[in-house]
């Protein structure tokens, strides 16, 4: 990620004596498995009690002879796991998963499919919904802030936003009335001829069969049911704000 160098520069400039830091990003490799039978697959490959790993839990597990760190996370809204291992083990791990997954009908899917499915869950991603240019209050990430924690970078500014009038824009999910093209990012959002926001990312949701987008819109308009206009490939399209997570709104599948 482009943020790695930015963070490493800050760490290097602010290290205290006798403290060392090393970026291990190139030493590890990750993949994810998703679907209602992913737990069965993982359980068959390890002797540990990974079946008891709770949603959002993480731990160290051996898959065969491969040491891994597994998190029970889901970007696509299904029961799933994210698995990380050393770079030298990734080919063996991939082969092991594909071979043992045949009995469950396993197959690989691409990055665009992942992006489509995460839109159906209203899951934002770095460099689109989340950047240094957007505040936690704008994107909803303020729910993860521990306000009782000692001073940290951005605490004062974030607290002033929280205790004041709030952010001037908020992240929302849109359903776009378009059958031939989808939003991709940075398209303007209009209301009564006035620009009131912009798209952060978009695509087609194949499970819900709708053109979807996420975007930042003026706070006074950021309510479900609000009708707006979006320019896609130079053409004005009707759109409306919808409740988050149009696919499996209660998140029952990924918590299965």
Residues of each region from the PLM?
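Conserved, structured C-terminal
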Residues: 1-256
